[in-house]
Amino acid sequence: MIQTAQHTLLDYQRDGFAVVEQVYAPAEIRALLAVIEQAGAQGGSFRRTADVFAIRNLLAELPALRPLIWNERFKELLHELLPAPQHLVKAIYFDKPAGSNWVVAWHQDLMVAVDRRAELPGFGPWNVRPEGVNVQPPRQYLDGICTLRIHLDACDAGNGALRVVPGSHRHGVIPAADIADFTPHAQVCPVPAGAVMLMKPLTLHASHRSLDERPRRVIHLEFSSQRLPAGLRWREDAAPAS
């Protein structure tokens, strides 16, 4: 067993993000990309333009990815971060192609994917997209989510690495009018290929356009050990595993 350095986990708790290197070997990255590149682009979960290729409900759409993602190092990391059972909250693939002008403004990840709509105290707003139902849950659920971003390419300021505000997750849901007060403390988070960036959903983050010809391909996974109330289920977790 290869344990994650204690200071990395402490950085994650304090700053709201951290990077764990060498989770996937080059051959494992090639295997993941092969499955993704063989996929079609049909249905509401797929979005393909000149600036972005994205797949939502990723593991429901491409179940062959599941055993490739859950290698021994990933399983160890997940167990270090969250007690069992770890529910899959969200799974998305992002490709920021070479020369992309796609910009992501400062935000927190406030919406979660669920299997249906249910009128519950503290849950809302709701929205329904082609891929399913999404809702903003109470803060306690957002605080319990851990995001693991698997980087299939090396990523830095030149090809759209995330900019993050250390410690911003500790301020809860930040009103849009107050975000500018936090961004002067932002920093770029470079991530090597095969590494996993850990992030808390309430960490303020943004992404600039790519400045060079390198792609930035990422598998974005969110997990929680919490159960939702009243029989509501995390949508990805409710999808059948293969």
Residue spans for each PLM region:
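Short, solvent-exposed loop/turn segments at secondary-structure junctions
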Residues: A25-P26, F94-K96, M111, C155-A157, ...
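A structural signal for short, well-ordered beta-strand segments
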Residues: K90-I92, L148-I150, I219-F223
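Catalytic core of non-heme Fe(II) oxygenases with the double-stranded beta-helix
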Residues: S100-P190, L228-R235
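Active-site rim elements
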Residues: L62-P67, V135, P184-H185, S207
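A structural signal for short, well-ordered beta-strand segments and their strand-loop junctions
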Residues: V19, H87-K90, T147, R163-V164, ...
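Non-heme Fe(II)-dependent double-stranded beta-helix
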Residues: M1-D15, V20-R129
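Non-heme Fe(II)/2-oxoglutarate
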Residues: Q42, L162, H169-Q187, P192-L198, ...
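Residues that flank catalytic or metal-binding motifs in active/ligand-binding sites
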Residues: V89, G144, G158-G160, P215-I219
